[in-house]
């Protein structure tokens, strides 16, 4: 487990870290498997692999809690979030206020295949099922012990389960293929830098149908003929 001590650059990051701490607390209380996914997890992976100074920084104000389908339908999940002051807004979004901060947790489930399945009724939630999340849940997590220094001087300690960088890449390349945003492209670049720094090779890539589809998308959109990623120092070509 890596130990990180990070300064928050903004109120938005304060909110994301506070929400992430709540995600970890809920998972520990219920004793369920989860991965913290999305922009905040990618940023933490760049610090875990020691490359944050080489890649673009990106702020996010929310925390995405990726969990197996049975956890989405767990009748204890909603009370656990509500006991921490969260109010449900929409099918799978939970919000609480901490002073002037608005903390947001989105609960996400794994899609069975390579396509996003929006607004799926599971238990009492209407959940987006995300392609690649199952791969991220099956791979061992990257556990980090974080001391977050918030902008008001508060120190917040937490232990977080991040996706393996390969799982994070699978998640993010599917996200890019679904919406083609510069933000997602930059995140792919950050994760590729982390994967190279971590010593991962082509033979380490998950050989599942979803893993192979993600590899195809990486080659298609981020191969040797693809322009440099927006805001990234990542090279133009990759062995994957």
Residue ranges, per PLM feature:
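Compositionally biased terminal segments of proteins
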Residues: 1-240
């Amino acid at each position: 487990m890596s130990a990180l001590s990070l300064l928050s650059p903004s109120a938005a990051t304060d909110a994301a870290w506070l929400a992430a701490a709540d995600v970890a607390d809920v998972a520990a209380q219920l004793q369920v498997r989860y991965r913290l996914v999305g922009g905040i997890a990618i940023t933490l992976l760049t610090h875990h692999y020691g490359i944050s100074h080489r890649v673009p920084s990106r702020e996010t104000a929310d925390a995405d809690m990726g969990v197996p389908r049975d956890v989405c339908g767990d009748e204890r999940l909603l009370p656990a979030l509500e006991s921490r002051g969260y109010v449900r807004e929409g099918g799978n979004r939970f919000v609480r206020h901490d002073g002037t901060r608005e903390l947001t947790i989105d609960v996400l489930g794994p899609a069975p295949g390579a396509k996003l399945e929006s607004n799926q009724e599971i238990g009492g939630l209407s959940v987006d099922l995300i392609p690649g999340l199952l791969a991220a849940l099956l791979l061992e997590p990257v556990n980090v012990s974080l001391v977050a220094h918030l902008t008001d001087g508060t120190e917040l300690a937490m232990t977080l389960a991040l996706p393996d960088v390969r799982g994070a890449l699978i998640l993010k390349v599917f996200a890019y293929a679904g919406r083609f945003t510069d933000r997602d492209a930059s995140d792919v670049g950050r994760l590729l830098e982390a994967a190279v720094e971590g010593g991962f090779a082509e033979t380490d890539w998950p050989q599942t149908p979803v893993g192979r589809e993600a590899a195809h998308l990486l080659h298609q959109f981020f191969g040797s003929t693809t322009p440099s990623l927006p805001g990234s120092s990542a090279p133009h070509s990759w062995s994957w």
